[in-house]
Amino acid sequence: MKSKVIGWNINQRSGMGKGIPKFVIDELIDQNADIIVLTELFQHSTIGYFWAEMERAGYQYAVTQNDGTNEVGILWKKDVYTFRAVDDSVVTTMKNNHPNFLLVDLEDQNGQLLTVVGFRIRMVDYSQRAEELEIVVNKGNEKKNPVLMVADCNNLRRETTETSWNLQVVDRILSKGGFERHTPGGQSIFEEKADRGYAYEFAEDHLITRDIAVELGDYDREFVRRDRIAYPWGKDFQTYDKEHSRRVSVEPGFPDHAIVKGYLSTEKDQKK
């Protein structure tokens, strides 16, 4: 079976926003994905409404318990997948060097087990980001079945000169576990198009797989049409303010990453 998956950093920024905007719920429901991974989620006082709306739309969910910092949420259609297990043992605190990380085991209608991982590499020193990804890969290696990871890697621009953290370092660490990165063209943050071309594109949101085939979609910024006030620059989440000689971004609480998405099938499906 083919499943649609989406990942979205919704920019709750450890509670700096005022809760999840209603249009985010509308967008998630209209995307009609079988699996949803959300990063920079926060357990705001209004989070109960969000979960209730997603449950009404046919989803079940699991969420980290990082207590006061960024969370990861994984949602799945309950008529497509059966929940088997959750691993929320990697807890993020302000004093440790753990990624935002959540893992769930799901079983599809054919009895195929699928492990889904949502993670976000934090904005720490570059060498520490590599260490966080090592934690992710080690957890993924505990599983022998197909694995899907949906990630915000905070990996800098495509051709950064930073040697301790870049896409090549990401790929090298992922390869230790047999994982493959799938990244759309273009940028997932900042402006829709990089001013100086491919080398300066910030493509930080990815699908990562093992024993899964992926039909990758484009980075999706179409949700900006739902709130023109929150997104005054259209599909650009950031712009340069010439009057004050500074860059300005959308307000915290409103997503400032494009949606990453794709369609998945396991190797077992491909052999049928």
Where are the regions that the model predicts?
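Structural recognition of the beta-strand scaffold that forms the well-ordered cores
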Residues: G7, I35-T39, G73-I74, T115-G118, ...
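Metal-dependent phosphoester-hydrolase catalytic domains
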Residues: V86-D87, N141-L148, N155-K272
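N-terminal, active-site-proximal structural segment of metallo-dependent hydrolase catalytic domains
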Residues: M1-R56, T69-E71, D256-A258, Y263-K272
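Structured beta-strand-rich core segments of catalytic domains in phosphoester-bond hydrolases
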Residues: I35, T39-L114
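Active-site-proximal beta-strand elements of phosphoester/diester hydrolases
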Residues: K2-S14, R84-D87, L103, Q112-M123
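His/acidic metal-ligating clusters that form di-metal
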Residues: L103-D105, Q112-T115, R129-E162
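Catalytic metal-binding/acid-base residues of hydrolase active sites
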Residues: N9-N11, L41-F42, R120-R122, C153-L156, ...
